[in-house]
Design a protein with these regions (language model features):
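N-terminal pre-Walker A segment at the start of P-loop NTPase domains
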Residues: 1-12
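Conserved lysine of the Walker
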Residues: 31
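Hydrophobic positions on the alpha1 helix immediately C-terminal to the Walker A/P-loop
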Residues: 34
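Conserved catalytic/switch belt of AAA+ P-loop NTPases
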Residues: 81-104, 112
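Interdomain motor-coupling "hinge/lid" segment immediately C-terminal to the ATP-binding subdomain
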Residues: 108-226
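Accessory nucleic acid-recognition modules appended to NTPase machines
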Residues: 176, 180-355
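Conserved catalytic cores of phosphodiester-cleaving nucleases, focusing on short active-site segments
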Residues: 319, 323, 345-349, 355-365, ...
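Domain-level recognition of nuclease-like catalytic cores that cleave nucleotide substrates
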Residues: 398-421
Length: 421
């Protein structure tokens, strides 16, 4: 069963406006299945024989009807150079589709950036809208367009137990379509195989110790949705595992995790405020999918229900995943704001045309919603008074549960299972 993906529109647009498209994202997020919709011929570099042949004759990999899909191109990095050279001599729109679940083993083998010829598209696991776990009552686009008739929905049949399951299940397509009683086991299998590199042709990953990668992931998971410094995470690795970890080794392993598209930190938003209070630039620690963090710590839905403080941090991570996917469809990006005066905003959705929306992420409940709304209004006032930015197009408290409505002060309250792009 195939569920349509929001990234499809981006792929279609890039194929109409670029010679090639490269779709990058973590393993098992659905890249190949989605890209197969657009190919007229394909080659999969998923066997030793195919990889060896592609490395010996990378130009031959390009032979076939266009659009030509080259799956896991990074296993034969010179394919990239051949695609770029072919487009230099015989440019056509939508000629090639490349997919990759990691960066190349040796980045020096890629001699050109591909700018102007190869358009990048980022693909993540499924959002709740894509997995059909969101009714889509509220559109992010409509909030930017300042909708007049805001929908009202009590959302009565959705509770924290539902949210806990979605956090632990993740947005992996195979888990999404599976019956609820086995979905978590499928996600567990994904985690168990994530760092199995014995037969990996990529020496940079094969030389990494899986147990060390898992230790670092666990430390990141313990600091999920926080601005923990790298030094703090290194100290956590040392203390939790009673082993040494020098910064150089940590950086090497961290690069591998980012090259596998597992860690996806959120950068700070800097609106150039005229103030003596500096804006903090430390990124917020996030995962491409929260289920990875859950599995790394052995956290179940029941565990989340027993610790609502941790629940809130893991929920924030899942909410950021969905906001990123939705923002991508609007040509925007998601960042966070925090200054040394303590004012913060969990997510700032910023569009290319300069419009922006401020989002506070809360589990729910009157007090937390009120706290979120107060913080949003304080941020709005500060931005308007002390920067050249316009007022936010919208302010939203994104909740785990509860109904959706617009408050008298203009702040929207929207549960995550009612949001769509």
């Amino acid at each position: 069963m195939y569920y349509n993906r929001l990234v499809e529109k981006q792929i279609e647009l890039k194929l109409k406006t670029s010679g090639a498209v490269v779709v990058a994202g973590p393993k098992f997020c659905g890249k190949t299945t989605t890209c197969m919709l657009y190919q007229k011929s394909f080659v999969k570099l998923n066997t030793k024989q195919a990889i060896t042949m592609a490395r010996m004759n990378p130009k031959g990999v390009l032979q076939g009807e266009n659009p030509r899909l080259i799956d896991e191109w990074q296993k034969a990095p010179d394919v990239w150079n051949q695609v770029k050279d072919d487009l230099d001599f015989n440019y056509e729109f939508g000629k090639y589709i490349l997919t990759g679940s990691s960066t190349p083993a040796d980045k020096t083998e890629v001699h050109h950036s591909g700018a102007g010829r190869i358009a990048p598209v980022r693909m993540r696991p499924m959002s709740l809208w894509e997995s059909k776990d969101s009714k889509g009552t509220v559109s992010l686009k409509s909030l930017f367009d300042e909708v007049e008739d805001f929908p009202w929905d009590m959302n009565e049949k959705f509770d924290l137990e539902n949210v806990a399951h979605l956090i632990c299940r993740g947005g992996w397509p195979v888990s999404v379509v599976a019956p609820k009683e086995i979905a978590l086991e499928i996600t567990k299998n994904y985690w168990n195989g994530l760092f199995v590199f014995e037969d990996c042709e990529n020496e940079r990953f094969r030389n990494k110790k899986p147990e060390v990668l898992k230790m670092i992931v666990r430390s990141f998971a313990r600091h999920i949705s926080t601005e923990a410094a790298i030094s703090t995470i290194i100290a956590d690795v040392r203390q939790s595992n009673e082993r040494t970890m020098d910064p150089k080794t940590f950086d090497d392993y961290m690069e591998a995790l980012k090259d596998l598209y597992i860690i996806e930190d959120m950068e700070a938003w800097n609106p150039n405020i005229r103030s003596k209070t500096p804006i903090r630039s430390t990124p917020t620690r996030h995962f491409v999918d929260t289920s990875i963090a859950c599995r790394s710590l052995g956290i179940s839905p029941d565990d989340l229900m027993q610790d609502l403080e941790s629940f809130g941090l893991f929920f924030e991570d899942m909410a950021v995943r969905d906001l990123r996917i939705y923002a991508d469809t609007l040509g925007g990006e998601v960042r966070h704001y925090r200054d040394n005066a303590g004012l913060e905003c969990d997510a700032v959705v910023h569009l290319e045309d300069g419009r922006w929306g401020a989002v506070e992420i809360k589990i729910g409940g009157d007090k937390l919603i009120e706290d979120g709304a107060t913080s949003l209004k304080t941020l709005r006032n500060k931005i308007v008074e002390k920067s050249e930015e316009k007022a936010p197009a919208f302010m939203m408290v994104l909740t785990a549960v509860g109904g959706t409505y617009r408050r008298d002060d203009g702040v929207y309250v929207v549960p995550i299972n009612l949001l769509k792009p």
